[in-house]
A protein has these predicted regions:
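C-terminal, surface-exposed recognition/capping segments
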Residues: 8, 23, 28-180
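N-terminal Sec-dependent export signals
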Residues: 1-19
Length: 180
């Protein structure tokens, strides 16, 4: 029989191995910051990756995370705070969630194209220098059950609510994307 400590240790080793396998590259799009080559919890650009509540540094195990369990007005912007920023916690100090301003720069200065990669629809975002990242759709339509839009958290809280701002694109969003 395995002891609880052995089980915990083997789970920690598994998580460590998975992190090492799935470590994104930093892609220079010619903007003020570099962007990850794929999502947290993904293994390649077309993988959706893990779902997160805003300000929680580990993936959600309860399905679609819409609202954070923390008061956004209390903690403020979470960029780089490993207690709240999943990118910093999982990938290290050189990684963090983008701010509203950085997402706005991505929106304003890049070319956005609808693409299908490995059978997954999303947006190919090409920077001024010609490098690109792929953002797969991660939200399903209630009517069709198909993935039809992408919602990506920013580090910036939406003051006066229990949520944060996100970069949205696809169905029911202003083209090519919007911060909401």
């Amino acid at each position: 029989d395995q002891s609880i400590n052995d089980i915990i240790h083997s789970q920690e080793e598994y998580v460590k191995e998975q992190r090492e396998k799935a470590f994104p590259n930093a892609v220079d799009l010619g903007l003020s910051v570099k962007w990850a080559s794929f999502n947290l919890g993904a293994y390649k650009p077309s993988d959706m990756g893990s779902m997160f509540y805003w300000a929680e540094n580990q993936p959600s195990t309860k399905g679609y995370p819409k609202y954070s369990k923390v008061k956004v007005d209390v903690i403020g912007d979470i960029a780089g705070d490993d207690k709240y920023d999943a990118a910093t916690n999982m990938l290290g100090r050189n990684w963090r969630l983008p701010t509203d301003e950085e997402c706005q720069e991505l929106l304003n200065r890049c070319k956005w194209e609808t693409k299908v990669i490995d059978g997954i629809e999303g947006r190919l975002v090409t920077g001024p220098n010609g490098n690109s990242i792929f953002l797969p759709f991660n939200q399903k339509s209630f009517t069709s059950g198909k993935y039809v839009s992408g919602h990506y958290w920013t580090s910036t809280p939406h003051h006066g609510s229990e949520s944060a701002n996100d970069l949205r694109f696809g169905e029911n969003c202003k083209p090519p994307a919007e911060i909401w």
